[in-house]
């Protein structure tokens, strides 16, 4: 498995969960203070179009956040009123979401960047809806993630072949996909039914 070493300040963004809508998103941002003293900081959010580099949003999101020594906390907030280019299998528009922790004096403590898109998928009246529009699933069975989970070239090549064959959706199998394959699916416009390790146990 790939390994990376990350050096950060004691106050660190541990994780973020992005819940997109058609005009914005809600964020669950987990921050931990690894130091032995209380820290105060502000949170800034930047949203940048991955293809064009244009800034969709950049602003101070939360002010004067405080974490005690060795404390971890989740901060939830929303950004609305945006007009993003939506993600679809035919137009897989993506954005870089940057979350910056900044002190009152302007020093950046940490910055986490995640790539995601603006999309919604729901079931209404027995039908599937992508971004509010009725959507007919065109899918295929699981693909060779388990054979080469760290092979980005295989992930991109296989998904591009899927697109040539008019297949826009697949499913995970045996084990959840890692970040590399999920990122390739986002980039290539492939929808994923994310199944658990034992999806068939509760059928009966």
Kindly label every feature range from the protein language model.
Residues 138, 199-204:
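Active-site-adjacent "subsite" loops/lids of carbohydrate-active enzymes
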Residues 1-192:
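Secreted/periplasmic carbohydrate-active enzymes, especially glycoside hydrolases
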């Amino acid at each position: 498995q790939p390994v990376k070493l990350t050096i950060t300040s004691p106050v660190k963004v541990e994780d973020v969960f992005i819940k997109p809508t058609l005009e914005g998103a809600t964020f669950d941002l987990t921050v931990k203070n690894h130091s032995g003293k209380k820290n105060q900081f502000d949170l800034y959010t930047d949203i940048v179009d991955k293809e064009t580099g244009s800034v969709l949003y950049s602003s101070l999101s939360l002010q004067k956040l405080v974490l005690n020594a060795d404390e971890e906390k989740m901060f939830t907030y929303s950004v609305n009123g945006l007009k993003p280019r939506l993600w679809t299998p035919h137009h897989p528009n993506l954005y870089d979401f940057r979350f910056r922790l900044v002190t009152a004096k302007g020093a950046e403590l940490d910055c986490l960047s995640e790539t995601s898109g603006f999309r919604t998928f729901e079931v209404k009246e027995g039908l599937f809806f992508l971004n509010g529009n009725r959507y007919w699933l065109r899918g295929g069975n699981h693909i060779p993630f388990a054979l080469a989970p760290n092979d980005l070239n295989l992930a991109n090549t296989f998904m591009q072949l899927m697109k040539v064959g008019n297949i826009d959706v697949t499913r995970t199998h045996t084990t959840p996909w890692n970040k590399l394959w999920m990122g390739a699916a986002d980039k290539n416009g492939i929808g994923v039914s994310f199944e658990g390790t034992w999806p068939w146990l509760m059928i009966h």
